[in-house]
Amino acid sequence: MWREGLATGNGVTGVSLYGGAKREILQLGRHDLWYDGLEEEVPDVHEALGRQRKKMEEGSFREASWEIVNALKEKGYDSRLESHIPVANLVVEQTPIKGFRSFRRSLDMEQALASQQWLDGGVLMRREVFVSRAVDMAVYRLSAEKEGMNRDLLEYTFQLSVFRNEGERPTEAIQAVWDAAQTEVVCEGEHTGYLLFNSRREKAAGAGSRQYDNKDVSATDFGAVAKLSVEEGRLEKLENGIKVKAAKEILVTIGLYVDEERASAWQRLRDSLGSQTKTFGQLLAESAKLHKALYHSAELWLGQDAVQAAGREEGQKVNREEGQKANRTEGHKESRKDTQEEWGRTNEDLVLEAFSDRQSVELIEKLWHYGRYLFICGSSPAANPFPLYGLWGGRYRLQWCHNMANENLQMIYWHSLCGNLIEYNQAVFRYMNDRIPAFKENARKLFGIDGIYMTAGTTPGVSSPTQVVPVIINWVGAAGWLAQHYYQYFLYTRDMGYARNVMIPYMDGVAGFYEEFVRFTTDGEGRERILFYPSVSPENTPVNFMPPEGKRIAHPMPTTINSTMDLSILKEFFKNMLTVSQIVGEDFFPRERIEKWNRILKAIPEFRSNGEGAVKEWQEDMFEDRYDHRHLSHIYPVFPGHEVYPEKDPGKIHAYEKAVSLRKIDAQTGWSMAHMAAIYARFRNGGKAMECLDNMARSSLLNNFFTLHNDWRGMNISLNMDPAPVQLDAIMGYVNAVQEMILYAAPGYIALLPALEERLSIGEVRNFRYSDGLVSMKWNQGRKQFECRITPLRPHKVQIVLPDFVEQGKWQETDAVSIAALREKVWEVEFLEGESEMVVFYGWNAGNDTVEY
């Protein structure tokens, strides 16, 4: 099945390899092939906001919840999100010799190389595929190896055709894609042939349609061209494909196109593929070099793998320092006692172990690498944002394949900061800024307000509201939440060109909306207090507004006043805007606007707790907390925000810990457990954080490491839902949670190894990022050994919190660094010059500068 495929890609083009020895499929996809959307002009219903607020003030919340939605429906508004679809399938069928044995699939993440191999009649059959980063094309090699074999036994057929998913009933739009499909076969002698495929699809259309990147509306063709090059065999033209016989090796190169007229695309790709003369190995080497730079931009080793990494490094030193050989070798032998775990097992073994008990150290490390691998293969700074299925979704109507900004899009990108893949956020910023005109129209038409209102769900061709239900339409927090990503990118890059041309145009629009949207009242003591309504805590409903038990209604009444999340977003956003105003100069924004921002901040009250001691999800008493839910929106001040953390706010943390602990386990999803793990890491509770990741691996992980929304087996950790859709935000959230356990980074503050669990007790990381520098660490918690290297990227001042197991710290003296101890295990470090380096180490003699495992 496509859900079990081996994924590879270059961020623009993706390939999923699945099938078997008889019939193998390369599912070919691109970031920009979306279809079957509808974007209508948004009708002006802004007067509904006044009616809605009046009903809310009167306590008629259920009726008020539908006010704007009903106004849209009464005017016949019916926009529809697009679906992300594959471009084509390359289907390869091979005639068996005696039947397969020893079938094996593998994925080399370091080279982005997917492969399958098996034995048939003593012949080693091998298939390998990658997508070149040097030249945007898929490269696929088929080979058969056996000394003295009769090659006439080898026979393959190749077909390049429209994507079809067995069992999926065609809608009118799907049938139109199938009916428009065209194929052509060209053979140039016995050793070179071409397969050409084209179809057409309906783009998002409608009276108010905003097309993709100003491309010609009529340019709806998409397709692929594949070149087959045969070594020592011969090919034969078939009606809809090519037959290859007796080949030692077959090299297939494939180029894809979207929104390009068929004839010109076919000619362009035939010319470019035809001029390609490099071998598979040469093409792989040049692509892998580019891929490795991204894959190794940050690195992690755990347990035995950290030992082996240190051993390799030590081995290099040993060659230079023969006199120390015996001691170091013996040290590594002894250290094996700390890491008694067999490594190198199959995914199936690792996943079964996680299902039966808990994750191994090997699985934790592999999942961290795999999430990053999918991220760099599934998007790029110049492409669309990473979608929930990456580039590997295998249906025409994938469930929830759009860009969803009430959790999922944010989770996909959280890891990119610490993980040193910061530039990938540019895909989100370009995507959102291109849609600012649409978001401003949304704000005017729905609310009668200037500025930006971004509906939570969008696709490349549809920026207007689509999911016309109260839980989506009435939530105005999406744009403010994404503003956090804009602001953090600036903190990490200090790029003033970006600030003026990208960040400020977006954040200024968000500020303009909130300035008009907020209302004020006074509390019992005469202090001004904010009223933010309608306000939604994403997808949750207060328990006192839930229907009677046994009656199932999706999102029955989400529309409230002053949800904790909305107020958290508002507080964070305007604090950041005040900082931005100082950076660009206070005269950049009118003084009256800055005064309004300060007024809003002053009017946001301290967040209150309920009778159980948990921070309230809605700050108004008429809304009661509901724990049977997956979203953790009201924990925003702890994560993904930085407002509350243990060292700064020890008195506040308990209320947030209590709120998380009350969430019911059978209401969770793959992504919510990753989110919860990151929260527990912020609480400095490594045990609970890892328990969440264990639960995620137990309930939402396929054998190819794709993650799902929920368990598909009717178990009791996640919610039950059929189908259980692929959602790759969970694996990205997993990466982030592991990083949060190893490094906490807030502006001007970092905590080293803040939330270790026993399976993270031995490890090494390199080039983890905080806003102004790079952190590399080695540690062995059991031996109380620790080493940290901090490399600044610019002069700055930062507080550094040492790990709990480090009783004292030492550092190398340098004129470029000023260090002061603030309190136990907390230092304030000022880097006076760029490119200096500070080294902290503990637990060995000064002459021994390495952690011994």
Stretches found by the model and what they are:
Residues 260-262, 387-402, 450-500, 515-595:
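The feature captures the catalytic groove of carbohydrate-active enzymes
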Residues 1-315, 328, 332, 336-470, ...:
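Aromatic-residue-lined binding/catalytic grooves and analogous aromatic/hydrophobic interfacial grooves
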Residues 51, 253, 431, 485, ...:
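Generic recognition of well-ordered alpha-helical segments
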